From Swiss-Prot:
The modification Phosphoserine is found at S101. It comes from Saccharomyces cerevisiae (strain ATCC 204508 / S288c) (Baker's yeast). The keyword Phosphoprotein applies. This is Uncharacterized protein YJR012C. Signal peptide: none annotated. Keywords: Phosphoprotein. Present with 538 molecules/cell in log phase SD medium. InterPro entries: KPWE_PEX14_dom. Residues 36-69, 97-132 are annotated as: Disordered. Copurifies with proteins HOL1, MMP1, PEX7 and PLB1.
């Protein structure tokens, strides 16, 4: 036996031919398990790269045509889509946009109006030096 517990090639052949146990090798019995003991896999097999692309394309095709049922009666649908109701919604939206733009202008004016507390902060006053 060589140093470090390793067998030379000739020693390994001698162990194999004479059916001697080989050091540092675990004997594993040749046992076949009963198929009835096998459990069912909980994970499905991973798709191969080319299969994944095919499934992705088929899912996109099915997503293009969703089957959605709406629980809306005809009267409420007509009420939501009537021209007067739509014009009211647009009117409210335009008023909100005007209010938002007014608030934005007020915010800008408030930022510019910061001063010493006088109301005349926006007015420009030039001081004339007095002669002595």
């Amino acid at each position: 036996m060589a140093a470090g517990g390793e067998l030379s090639y000739e020693e390994l052949l001698d162990h194999i031919l004479n059916n001697k146990p080989i050091p540092n090798i675990v004997e594993v019995p040749n046992v076949t398990l009963d198929e009835g003991l096998a459990s069912t896999p909980s994970l499905r097999p991973r798709p191969r790269p080319w299969e994944g692309q095919l499934q992705h394309q088929s899912h996109q095709g099915s997503l293009d045509k969703p089957n959605i049922s709406l629980d809306i009666d005809q009267e409420s649908l007509e009420g939501m889509t009537s021209l007067t109701r739509l014009s009211e919604c647009y009117d409210i939206q335009s008023k909100l946009q005007i209010n938002d733009s007014d608030n934005d202008n007020d915010d800008n004016n408030n930022d510019n109006n910061k001063g010493d507390g006088n109301d005349d902060d926006n007015n420009t006053v030039t001081a004339n030096p007095t002669a002595r």
